[in-house]
């Protein structure tokens, strides 16, 4: 993560409550596109809408950075994350076979033009 934070093409947002870091989300820009690298929420704060807020703000940051398309990959078994991504307009693009040991990864994208 330290390497990611020091990369000039990476941007991260941090969620805090009372100065406690409860989550973060980041992307890596590649020309006019970006890969979402992380969305992490502390276990005790999950299912409270914080992941949605972080991802919504990451999308706004991407727009400010003139990013036209966001990509991500997610474990096929991570149903809550897939639901969140679909709720925010990400579409399934493809599958990475056995990307997570024996589980497939799902590649998703969101076009930001006209968003």
Q: Where do the language-model regions lie?
A:
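Acetyl-CoA-dependent GNAT
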Residues: 1-44, 55-61, 65, 94, ...
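Conserved functional loop/turn residues at catalytic and ligand-binding sites
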Residues: 40, 44-45, 49, 66, ...
